[in-house]
Amino acid sequence: MIIQDVELVKVARTPGDYPPPLKGEVAFVGRSNVGKSSLLNALFNKKIAFVSKTPGKTRSINFYLVNSKYYFVDLPGYGYAKVSKKERMLWKRLVEDYFKNRWSLQMVFLLVDGRIPPQDSDFMMIEWMKSLNIPFTIVLTKMDKVKMSERAKKLEEHQKEFSRYGEYTIIPTSSVTGEGISELLDLISTLLKEN
């Protein structure tokens, strides 16, 4: 997929804020500070998604219109302890409504920090998506920060951890070096063309 144009068209804080569904869309979810915005900017080859060093900055569902026909959707991060319980529940309801009611959703990309073992919150997200029959692909982020001598071991550890849920594609990426970006775009292109 070649991304020719991208525009942030909607910042949704309630389900009523969602734009009408298009032919297809993909969503990106992960723990706070996993690198969602940086990965989106790498996919877009443009700095459009706000990047912050402070966890929990994405507090809405952000819809990016790509090539005037598809949505790339940035979901709020999970697992950030300093956010109030009330706000976490609001995010959970917002994301749950999105998962249940967006018929145009083709795939969720679950972003996991490749430097560390998957966290309990990552497993909870997988179980939640599986319970809702949401298709997903696992994307390891920040792989540029993993020493070359440790990469094979880290990938193997992640594959072993996630294998309890079945066989899933795992794509190692880096928004800094561009690793995995074209592979991810190719997968997205295939998904959106099929539907």
From Swiss-Prot:
Sequence positions that bind Mg(2+): S37, T58
Gene Ontology annotations for the cellular component aspect, listed alphabetically: cytosol
Gene: engB
Protein family according to the UniProt entry: Belongs to the TRAFAC class TrmE-Era-EngA-EngB-Septin-like GTPase superfamily. EngB GTPase family.
Annotated residues for binding of GTP: 30-37, 56-60, 74-77, 141-144, 173-175
Gene3D superfamilies: P-loop containing nucleotide triphosphate hydrolases (3.40.50.300)
Cofactors demanded by this protein: Mg(2+)
Annotated EngB-type G domain residues: 22-194
Function: Necessary for normal cell division and for the maintenance of normal septation.
Entries under PROSITE patterns matching the protein: G_ENGB (PS51706)
GO MF annotation terms: GTP binding; metal ion binding
Record-given protein name: Probable GTP-binding protein EngB
A Pfam family the protein falls into: MMR_HSR1
Keywords for the protein's UniProt record, in alphabetical order: Cell cycle, Cell division, GTP-binding, Magnesium, Metal-binding, Nucleotide-binding, Septation
InterPro entries, alphabetized: G_ENGB_dom, GTP-bd, GTP-bd_ribosome_bio_YsxC, P-loop_NTPase, Small_GTP-bd
Biological-process GO terms, alphabetical: division septum assembly
Organism (species): Thermotoga petrophila (strain ATCC BAA-488 / DSM 13995 / JCM 10881 / RKU-1)
